């Protein structure tokens, strides 16, 4: 996925909290684990136009990291933020922030990386990579829905 791109989901009603589970095998390139879309929904007015509503994802589990090899492998976890919603009105950020760098995962071990309760907004991407291809499996669960308080024109 290219940076500065927000996927838009056209729907008649966006979800409040659709549960999603993701399991992926990491490579030496950053692999997207959570990508948050916007929702194109009907505007409740005469004439039937649509409006863009930003999406939001809430992490409900730790990132489970499992090493399938006998050797210690290292992983990095980062988030790409498109907007800063702590500002009013939201401002463009388009920056990548490291959450963890070179976490050692011992051979045949499984570790939880706590992300429970973290929020990601439309355009945000949570990514992870390993220093060895196909040695690490990761699993994370989250809910995705519409961030109603941040309606866009």
Question: Where does each model-flagged region fall?
Answer:
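Short acidic, flexible loop segments centered on an aromatic residue
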Residues: 62, 66-88, 130, 142-143
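Intrinsically disordered, low-complexity Pro/Gly/Ser/Thr-rich segments with frequent PxxP/GP/PP motifs
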Residues: 83-125
């Amino acid at each position: 996925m290219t940076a500065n791109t927000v996927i838009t989901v056209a729907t008649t009603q966006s979800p409040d909290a659709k549960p999603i589970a993701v399991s992926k095998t990491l490579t030496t390139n950053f692999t997207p684990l959570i990508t948050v879309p916007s929702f194109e929904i009907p505007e409740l007015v005469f004439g039937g136009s649509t409006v863009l509503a930003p999406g939001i994802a809430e992490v409900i589990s730790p990132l489970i990291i499992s090493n399938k090899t006998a050797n210690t492998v290292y992983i990095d976890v980062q988030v790409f933020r498109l907007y800063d919603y702590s500002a009013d009105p939201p401002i463009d950020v388009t920056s990548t922030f490291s959450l963890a760098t070179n976490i050692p995962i011992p051979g045949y071990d499984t570790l939880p990386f706590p992300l429970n309760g973290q929020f990601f907004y439309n355009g945000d991407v949570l990514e992870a990579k390993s220093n060895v291809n196909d040695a690490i499996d990761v699993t994370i669960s989250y809910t995705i829905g519409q961030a109603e308080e941040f309606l866009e024109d």
